[in-house]
Amino acid sequence: MAKTDTASFDSILVLDFGSQYNQLITRRIRDFGVYSELLPNTITAEEIKARHPKGIIFSGGPNSVYDDGAFRVDPEIFKLGLPILGICYGMQLMTYTLAGGKVESADNREYGKANIDVTSDSATLFKDTPAEQSVWMSHGDLVTQAPDGFDVVATSKNCPIAAIQDVDRKLYGIQFHAEVRNTDYGNDILRHFAFDVCQAEANWSMDDFIDMQIEKIRAEVGDKKVLLGLSGGVDSSVVGVLLHKAIGTQLTSIFVDHGLLRKGEADQVMASLEGKFGLNIIKVDAKDRFLSKLAGVSDPERKRKIIGNEFIQVFDEEATKLNGMEFLAQGTLYTDVIESGTSTAQTIKSHHNVGGLPEDMQFKLIEPLRTLFKDEARELGEKLGMPSDLVWRQPFPGPGLGIRVIGEITEDKLEIVRDSDFILRDEIKKAGLDREIWQYFTVLPGIKSVGVMGDGRTYDYTVGIRAVTSIDGMTADFARIPWDVLQKISVRIVNEVDHVNRIVYDVTSKPPSTIEWE
């Protein structure tokens, strides 16, 4: 029997202290089949107790425990008797809070790969892992004295206390980031915490998520009406099908053709969602309106905000025509939230689904995918019976091609990106790489260069190709596309797309870059 309340699952709570990786901790635990969610560090012991979790994880963070305004935790949490794992800042905070512990500024800061030595045969989290292993460090402070009752179980060259444990109280700390894939045995460490220490049961699944969200949506919406903004991407499409399953005709979807869509996208969206699933979709042609607002604007943040605001204004106008629309649904994902910044994390970039919303918005928000990563959203789509060609469409940002034209947006520039992106996707699919490469698209950097075509001099645009491999979009590496495939793509773009004479390939990972250029 499907579960419809989070209390029905064994869960591990992650407290947010500001690390850009904190969502990954939640994701890793969920990968084990254990429900997990990220909560503010201001949560009280009583609030945690009411949730009945199997354990707690303190995330990393940018603060020093000695900073004014540094994030703290309710000390009563340590009296709940629950297993706690502190990661990086989380370990330092645990040490700072408990008696006998000491944290100091490091003489030699560690950022990146480091080797640790596991010094105890009874190190619970390191069971069945090598005595020497590579981990991912990112810290300027370190623990110089473990709290009373703790044993030091791992060290590194620049960090004499790299891991600690108090088995009796089920308290554990690691100075490195087990959630990052650069830590060789990170999954093993987190798995030992979830199952050996917390004794959690793997009873969480996507089927449960669907049932839980449907019940939650019905309870929140009641008999009211919901307006959904379809962007043409995977996320909003999945939200549309999920909402339709939950509330049927109470959902009206607005598909705004803002002139920033990919080639043939508008027709594909209408055919897939209106035709197959029966969604009630109103298509709005707002191309001239959006391009007029964006004229002369080069700053990427301004472009995002303008596009977000225009979307809401269009929705407001359509809602007025429809009468009684109280809710606005969006396809916001976990990665959107973290990159837009939380109360603890710095903003990397504002997302259309998060940062572009005006303060006087007339709708109540519904974001059913807010706790999911991209691949989880795809899994959800498949579980809902959506066709694979729709579920596996390339990720597409809310602002569309507006952030793939670097600088000022014009119709001519959009056409270059639209046509070149179509060629890229076509050749990647022909090569059988469309499921191997996580995301791929073209971008117009706004650079012109000299070329020779037809024995004549040209001075035309450069098109950039961005292709990455990833699991969840939080970290990514550039895809190693075979040279012959890249050559075909390059030749076709230069020959078939007007005003282009040069192709470049982005070979940067995330971090330091983001996947999108803007």
UniProtKB/Swiss-Prot annotation:
Keywords of the record, alphabetical order, are: ATP-binding, Glutamine amidotransferase, GMP biosynthesis, Ligase, Nucleotide-binding, Purine biosynthesis
User: What is the catalytic activity of this protein?
Assistant: XMP + L-glutamine + ATP + H2O = GMP + L-glutamate + AMP + diphosphate + 2 H(+)
Pfam families tied to this protein: GATase (PF00117), GMP_synt_C (PF00958), NAD_synthase (PF02540)
Instruction: Tell me the pathway.
Output: Purine metabolism; GMP biosynthesis; GMP from XMP (L-Gln route): step 1/1
| Species | Lactiplantibacillus plantarum (strain ATCC BAA-793 / NCIMB 8826 / WCFS1) (Lactobacillus plantarum)
> What protein name does the entry list?
GMP synthase [glutamine-hydrolyzing]
Matches recorded under InterPro entries = Class_I_gatase-like, GATASE, GMP_synth_C, GMP_synth_GATase, GMP_synthase, GMPS_ATP_PPase_dom, NAD/GMP_synthase, Rossmann-like_a/b/a_fold
Q: What are the binding positions for ATP in this chain?
A: S231, G232, G233, V234, D235, S236, S237
Q: Cite the GO molecular-function annotations of the record.
A: ATP binding; GMP synthase activity
Subunit structure comment from the entry: Homodimer.
The protein's Enzyme Commission number: 6.3.5.2
Q: Where is the Glutamine amidotransferase type-1 domain?
A: 11-203
Record-annotated GMPS ATP-PPase domain positions: 204-393
Its annotated function is as follows: Catalyzes the synthesis of GMP from XMP.
Task: Name the NCBIfam families on file.
Answer: guaA_Cterm, guaA_Nterm, PRK00074.1
Indicate the residues that form the catalytic site.
C88 (nucleophile), H177, E179
Q: Which domain of life is it from?
A: Bacteria
UniProt keyword Transferase present: no
Q: Does the keyword Heme apply?
A: no
Concerning Gene3D superfamilies, the annotation shows: 3.30.300.10, 3.40.50.880, HUPs (3.40.50.620)
Which lineage do the record's taxonomy fields give for this organism?
A: Bacteria, Bacillati, Bacillota, Bacilli, Lactobacillales
Taken from the UniProt entry, a GO cellular component term is: cytosol
